[in-house]
Amino acid sequence: MLQQDSNDDTEDVSLFDAEEETTNRPKKSRIRHPVASFFHLFFRVSAIIVYLLCELFSSSFIACMVTIILLLSCDFWAVKNVTGRLMVGLRWWNHIDEDGKSHWVFESRKASPQEGKTVSEAESRIFWLGLVACPVLWVVFAFSALFSFRVKWLAVVIMGVVLQGANLYGYIRCKVGSRKNLTSMATTYLGRQFLRQTTGDTQTSSGE
């Protein structure tokens, strides 16, 4: 697997194909992509259900493991390549330049002033709820499998944590930007808090 370089090789761009834009925009509160919204939750929820219930319906660990891994793989591909782009206008991917150097690209589609908001609020809630909640559940399953000595399931659970955690990390990077932007945001926030506290202390002293 390609790893991100220690140098800042990430790119934050907002380049999406123009053909993906539509002229007639439904209301932002409506679900504009019902099929994408369904499959955004279907594969990841199905993997969790199979993990919890498979031993009740099948005594074959191999069959359960293969089913869960297939569902997790389908979920990873669908969320990374389809649902994120359609539901929230975000996309992350990797490319190799002419020098053979790996670059991670985090895209965020920005609406033009004429179009207004291009992301449905309902779809955004569905997307982020599924994206955050399911990896948290897999982390809980990992601790449960570890402490209950279910060693054979640990590899399956770790696969769930890695695949769904990778999508969560990628889309958070798309949403908030690169490490430089995160540092800038933190510095700006601390500066504002300090300025606000200093201003408040000055006003209090003046009042006395």
Curated annotation (Swiss-Prot):
Region ranges (Disordered): 1-27
Subcellular location: Membrane
GO biological process: protein secretion; vesicle-mediated transport
Keyword Endoplasmic reticulum applies: no
Family note: Belongs to the TVP23 family.
Principal location class: membrane
Pfam families documented for this protein: DUF846
Record-linked InterPro entries: TVP23-like (IPR008564)
Protein name per its UniProtKB record: Golgi apparatus membrane protein TVP23 homolog B
